[in-house]
């Protein structure tokens, strides 16, 4: 068998060409690698030792704003099951500081989100509102959570596939309230119906979960009666604050008479 020799100079030149080609291929691969962020959601109070993962959050919407507070992108997931292992992985290529606003609920369709347009809408123009009908809402609107986070991203085109972790501590903006009303001195008539009405103007929120301007509206719930003729009703109310003149009334639905009114 004859073995053909290769001149050393020729071999070195071929090897150099291969290395140059590999460098080019690697660079092209890196520039095309997916990059983005992994969103994580939890809830933890300042005194809490461990994070909680609210089962009420089954849907999330995340809005990303640049260093000028202008909307650059939006991400969502309608099949959320929060846990320590859950994450919403999104592709995002951006250099500079980003601020994220996350909203969560069992059903975000219960809320009206202001119109958003990428490259135009600012963070200060964001608002989220309860969907009302004739200035009324169900006594148990869907729970609502909000969370804020930020991150600074460098140019990562030559770093391959990188996903930064962004975590949201989700604050609930809804309150569960239970009312029990004892009749004094006479029991409530069994043949009459009663409702509890709460009037407030806490149905609209800005990007950081603060109450924004809103017309007054009513939460209304039918009061149930137990064997001792005590009236009971359960409410889920939006964020409550002192000094907002939140009024609660007990109304005889049969006669239309307002039996009791107080500032909640």
PLM region descriptions:
Residues 1-10:
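Bacterial N-terminal signal peptides that target proteins for export
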Residues 130-229:
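A sequence/structural signal for flexible, mid-protein segments enriched
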Residues 73-171:
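Short, low-hydrophobicity acidic/polar segments
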Residues 50-54:
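Short consensus segments that form the blades of beta-propeller domains
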Residues 28-47, 170-182:
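A short, Gly/Thr-enriched small/hydrophobic beta-strand-prone motif that recurs across taxa
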Residues 18-21:
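C-terminal motif of bacterial Sec signal peptides marking the signal peptidase cleavage site
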Residues 60-114, 189-264:
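Tryptophan-paired
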Residues 23-26:
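Bacterial signal peptide processing site
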């Amino acid at each position: 068998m004859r073995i053909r020799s290769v001149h050393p100079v020729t071999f070195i030149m071929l090897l150099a060409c291969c290395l140059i080609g590999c460098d080019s291929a690697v660079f092209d691969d890196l520039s095309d690698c997916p990059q983005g962020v992994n969103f994580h959601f939890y809830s933890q109070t300042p005194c809490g030792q461990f994070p909680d993962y609210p089962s009420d959050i089954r849907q999330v919407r995340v809005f990303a704003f640049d260093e000028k507070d202008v909307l650059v992108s939006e991400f969502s997931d309608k099949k959320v099951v929060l846990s320590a292992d859950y994450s919403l992985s999104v592709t995002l290529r951006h250099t500079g500081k980003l601020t994220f606003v996350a909203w969560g609920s069992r059903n975000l369709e219960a809320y009206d989100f202001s119109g958003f347009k990428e490259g135009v809408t600012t963070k200060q123009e964001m608002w989220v509102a309860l969907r009302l009908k004739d200035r009324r809402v169900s006594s148990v609107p869907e729970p609502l959570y909000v969370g804020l986070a930020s991150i600074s991203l460098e140019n990562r085109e030559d770093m391959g596939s990188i996903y930064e972790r962004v975590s949201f501590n989700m604050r609930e903006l809804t309150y569960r309230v239970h009312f029990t009303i004892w009749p004094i001195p006479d029991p409530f008539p069994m043949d009459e119906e009663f409702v509890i009405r709460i009037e407030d103007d806490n149905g609209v929120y800005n990007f950081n979960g603060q109450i924004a301007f809103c017309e007054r509206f009513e939460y209304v719930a039918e009061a149930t009666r137990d064997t001792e003729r005590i009236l009971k009703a359960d409410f889920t109310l939006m964020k409550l604050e002192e000094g907002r003149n939140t009024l609660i009334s007990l109304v005889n639905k049969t006669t239309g008479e307002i039996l009791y009114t107080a500032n909640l």
